[in-house]
């Protein structure tokens, strides 16, 4: 591990200290390491450098919408090679929450997630991508 020195303006340091307290970091170093990891991960995603990933796709949908449940199930089966696991939750009489764990090439995971989120009556779709 290397020790470095940085200069941060007072307002930014105050905001960082608030975040450290709220999130319960033991020290500033660990908080800055996490921020650096997150920034590097985001940059590699934007630049297309991340070859393989694990993705967490979460979305809600109206299960009573005509054939939607069947379409979503077929989509998962059609991509069985990247769909590792799914959790299904009944939110109320009409709405369900699906959380899917995906593992593959980053482009394939994004394509799958985009396809699911584009279905009519699928709402609040979010994909979190983690590097492998």
UniProtKB/Swiss-Prot annotation:
Keyword Transferase listed: no
A Pfam cross-reference name: RHH_1
Cofactor-binding details, from the entry: Binds 1 nickel ion per subunit.
Binding residue positions for Ni(2+): 77, 88, 90, 96
UniProt protein name: Nickel-responsive regulator
Function recorded in the entry: Transcriptional repressor of the nikABCDE operon. Is active in the presence of excessive concentrations of intracellular nickel.
UniProt xrefs under PANTHER family: NICKEL-RESPONSIVE REGULATOR
GO biological process, one term: response to nickel cation
Keyword Transcription regulation part of the UniProt annotation: yes
Domain of life: Bacteria
GO MF assignments: DNA binding; DNA-binding transcription factor activity; nickel cation binding
Similarity annotation: Belongs to the transcriptional regulatory CopG/NikR family.
NCBIfam families recorded: nikR, PRK02967.1, PRK04460.1
Cofactors named for this entry: Ni(2+)
Organism: Brucella melitensis biotype 1 (strain ATCC 23456 / CCUG 17765 / NCTC 10094 / 16M)
């Amino acid at each position: 591990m290397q020790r470095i020195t940085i200069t941060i303006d007072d307002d930014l340091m105050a905001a960082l200290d608030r975040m450290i307290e709220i999130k319960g970091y033991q020290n500033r170093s660990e908080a800055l390491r996490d921020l650096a990891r997150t920034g590097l991960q985001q940059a590699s995603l934007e630049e297309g450098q991340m070859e393989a990933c694990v993705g967490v796709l979460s979305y809600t949908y109206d299960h009573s919408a005509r054939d939607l449940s069947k379409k979503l199930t077929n989509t998962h089966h059609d991509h069985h090679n990247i769909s590792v696991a799914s959790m299904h939750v009944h939110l109320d009489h009409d709405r369900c929450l699906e959380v899917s764990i995906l593992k593959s090439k980053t482009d394939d995971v994004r394509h799958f997630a985009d396809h699911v989120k584009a279905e009519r009556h699928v709402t609040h779709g979010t994909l979190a991508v983690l590097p492998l």
